[in-house]
């Protein structure tokens, strides 16, 4: 580890609903796939992890049938058999996350729409342990690449034109800010399709993060800075 580098961790989750609903709420979701990578401001990769959560993927097999990407379950099994992904307990995934953070002295964790990833992990922790309300340690910064992109990418005239030209607009006619569309803009690859698997999605999210830093502009970044700022599901 190079102590001169400010290492960062980029994380992504894939989830299944506890109760079937048309609304996508992190408080109704359980994490079955968590992937992360260690990177820096330039987007260089130093370590990757890909875990399938046993208690949800196996223990909640019926709920897995309602996952938005349930059709990927056979591919997950192929990846587990090949060693591409590891099937582990939730506590094991968290322990290894903390070990990686200590190894690289990480104090910032990024996700695209961190509100969702943070709270579905909190929900999963509560669901499995019946007592723990949180997943991340309290002494780190949770950062949101979606907020960063909204401040430094979406206002760009070139991005607005890109979205208009390719019909990447929401119902109000505003440019969309999905990780897939942002990456298409950054990379110039209009055929790019997001994998919607944990580790693979972090590969594009770290590019969004690096692109935002490269702009050297003021931007929102921190979602929750400490435990006093955490939002928990109301009882």
Where are these regions (language model features)?
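Conserved non-catalytic scaffold segment of RNase H-like nuclease domains
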Residues: 2-122
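A short, structured active-site edge motif that brings together acidic residues
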Residues: 51-54, 135-153
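Short, polar/flexible loop-turn hinges at active-site or ligand-entry regions and domain interfaces
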Residues: 80-84, 131-136, 189-195
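Substrate-recognition/cap helix-loop segment adjacent to the acidic, metal-dependent catalytic center
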Residues: 115-143
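Conserved protein kinase catalytic core
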Residues: 18-20, 150, 207
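Short alpha-helix plus adjacent loop in nuclease-associated cores
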Residues: 143-170
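Acidic, Mg2+-coordinating catalytic module of metal-dependent nucleases/exonucleases
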Residues: 105-115, 119-120, 162-235
